[in-house]
Amino acid sequence: MRILTEKALKEYIEFHPETKTALQEWSYIVRHSEWHNFADIKRTFNSVDAVGNQRYVFSIMGNNHRIVVVIEFTIYFVYIRFIGTHPEYERMNRNIGANNI
């Protein structure tokens, strides 16, 4: 898979350095995966959730941080729409819904 917005990970790590190892590992696994559907993602990351509208939510560092992505399976693109702490994600999810990010 190709992560189109890898810069977002680097910027998030600058503000949350404790996430560096976990986000680098997540990025490495994603880049070396070839997903065709949600079942493929689930085999790679058991804690991922499909929230609709091609959006998927990954829990990072024991659910302390969340990544919301859009995945285009046919062209193997992963587009990061949101990275934040769990409370930030919950606020945003209440306001607009994860499937609208």
Stretches found by the model and what they are:
Residues 1-64, 73-79, 86-101:
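Basic, Lys/Arg-enriched alpha-helical interface segments
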